[in-house]
Amino acid sequence: MEVEKLALKYALINAIEHDGKANPKAVIGKILGENPELRKKAREIVPIVNKIVEEVNTLSLEEQKKKLEEIYPEYFMEGTKKEKEEKKQLPPLPKAEKGKVVTRFAPNPDGAFHLGNARAAILSYEYAKMYDGKFILRFDDTDPKVKRPELIFYDMIIEDLEWLGIKPDEIVYASDRLEIYYKYAEELIKMGKAYVCTCPPDEFRKLRDQGIACPHRDEPVEVQLERWKKMLNGEYREGEAVVRIKTDLNHPNPAVRDWPALRIVDEPNHPRTGNKYRVWPLYNFASAIDDHELGVTHIFRGQEHSENETRQRYIYEYFGWEYPVTVHHGRLSIEGVILSKSKTRKGIEEGKYLGWDDPRLGTIRALRRRGILPEAIRELILEVGLKKSDATVSWDNLAAINRKLVDPIANRYFFVADPIPMYIEEAEEFEAKIPLHPDHPERGYRVLKFEPGKPIYVSKDDLSLLKPGGFIRLKDLFNVEILEVGDTIKARFHSHEYEVARKNKWRMIHWVPEGKECEVIIPEGEELIIRKGLLEKNANVKEGEIVQFERFGFVRIDKIENDKVIAIYAHK
């Protein structure tokens, strides 16, 4: 197909999908991406595309559609990009009404949140958005003893959610709501649906396991209220009294029988409330009250937490409330990657991990640092969807999604790991002009200069391709014959033409004339492998940028210090 016809086709498609205005850069990228043989003619193609895009943009949207139907009717059979994306929507929610759906994500700020947590966050947010509803971020921070919240993690979670494209309509801190929990606890005691138990924990456990009532269970409400006041005013110490919700003492799951709702923590030293409060609600009590108070209509909950609903329904039944629709999903994990907050914390404290963003981990911060885009995480989670079974994805699954997203945006550079000098005889000075991206000539070029008498550097990884008497092509430079291989390599210029190398099936390797020091950190299971080498001297990379080191892989530039570049390997 002639370039003009291709340009017209893609200009019309791009215009129709973008309110009648085509983008010449996008059209050029599409033409070269699907027709790589035209890349060598990129300079000639650009003015042709610019002219056709200008003409297409003068047409009305209806005229553009009519013209495209004449030259490419298949487009309308396939459906537009937008229509295709809409087909990938999540399944409808039960009992969901437009404008009335309220969802929540309730992380404990005792550590950075990870891919597994992100599933509930993304599903909750996407469904709220789908139904023009409301998404609440509720910090579940009422355990100042076992899962102690820390101020740094409140901010981390908000930042990570924003990076994932999740903007809460409301942020709620459970630790700000203790007076509300106290009010409902007292009401339940007055209703005879809760009581204050002062049994030693072991003694209560024995009674519970036998389905026998605790001696305090059926004592008068007045006695219970007196004990409740003692809990609040400090007359009971930690472990001496607990508020329990009355349930079925013969329930098949002993953990459901008269479960604990509030307990005493003598010196909570809470990061937000200090030691102001000493009676703290447990998760199921605080969560049940807040879901009602905040008007939550739909809860997305891991299958492993399904018993929470059983406990919480007792409170809803006692108050005559309607329990939110609960959607259970399985766990999500990555093969060989640690998601456990307790294991991560222990590893950090022992010096095993560098921090919550150590690239070996599965925290959102670690994935971000490694070069995974937020869109890749969202796409992965939406693909898995609401499956009730546990899902373990391989790193390759996530990498494949990410590769598709980063490939069009990542500029290309040469990085030579473990460099070995190569001296080339009989070669004249030559400048290799290489596009920053093969599909986007409009981004510009990088120039690598070969100077006679000076070495270039090739990677030790390519030594097996270098045999005396053999030939190779130096990518975007010229072809050489290998003369000697040792601590240095000697070669002789052969020819410039790529066709010569292609015809003879000579292997192609990358190189740098001189370079800036560069280290690539490669996560491999529990290890961090460091590859040292040289990056193109004039590589204009910035911290946080994702680029491709050709023949090596996609990396994220982590740090630049004193002209030394440190990158983290993402994937091939």
Curated annotation (Swiss-Prot):
One Pfam family matching this protein: tRNA-synt_1c_C2
Subcellular locations according to the entry: Cytoplasm
Record keyword Cell inner membrane present: no
Gene3D superfamilies: 2.40.240.100, HUPs, Ribosomal Protein L25, Chain P
Broad class of enzyme this protein falls into: ligase
InterPro entries per record: Gln/Glu-tRNA_Ligase, Glu-tRNA-synth_arc/euk, Glu/Gln-tRNA-synth, Glu/Gln-tRNA-synth_Ib_cat-dom, Glu/Gln-tRNA-synth_Ib_codon-bd, Rbsml_bL25/Gln-tRNA_synth_N, Ribosomal_bL25/Gln-tRNA_synth, Rossmann-like_a/b/a_fold
Motif ('HIGH' region): 107-117
A GO cellular component entry from the record: cytosol
GO molecular function, one term: ATP binding
The EC number(s) this enzyme carries: 6.1.1.17
GO annotation, biological process: amide biosynthetic process; glutamyl-tRNA aminoacylation
Function (record text): Catalyzes the attachment of glutamate to tRNA(Glu) in a two-step reaction: glutamate is first activated by ATP to form Glu-AMP and then transferred to the acceptor end of tRNA(Glu).
Family as reported in the entry's similarity comment: Belongs to the class-I aminoacyl-tRNA synthetase family. Glutamate--tRNA ligase type 2 subfamily.
Identification of the protein by name: Glutamate--tRNA ligase
Gene (name only): gltX
